[in-house]
Amino acid sequence: GSTLDLTRPSRQRLGDDAAIARLTRELETGAVAVLVTSGVNPIHELPEGGQWAELLTKVPVWVAVAERVDETAALARYLCPSPHPFESWGDYEPIAGTVCLRQPTTAAVGDTRSLDASLAAWSGAPLAAEELLRARWRDAVFDASTDGPSFDAFCDRSRRDGWNRRSDPAVAALHFD
């Protein structure tokens, strides 16, 4: 059978406990001056969530980009509302080499902006989320794809199918902890 495919592993739930431990130490020493959190709720999800609640509130500039006010976003110094996935453009790579495209299925209910669009605006180069996604796909997905005579045809096919395949997926070495 082919239960495990080690050449194209799942890229879902790629948590990094060592990175969390490093960030915890940096928060404890006051080494973090600016922190942007998005799509995470460490105060609720981590075993040491209570400690994180105390540490995060000491960060001078802490911005939470969140779809809802959860335990973590409620304590942030700045809260930027982000759209629900049904309201926004996005992409993800659930399996190495298979890049999926998410497009809005409904209009945004509130005045929200995606993390990508917020970062672009804060850096002085405001672009709509769809434009940012197209630029990323032009640079990172289209050049490495195995099909598509032109970028526009490639985008049309990807929007229609909801995914495309990269010919050179960057596959990290697998290890089991």
Name each region found by the language model.
Residues 1-155:
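Non-catalytic alpha/beta scaffold blocks inside enzyme catalytic domains
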Residues 139-177:
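Long, low-complexity segments enriched in small/aliphatic residues
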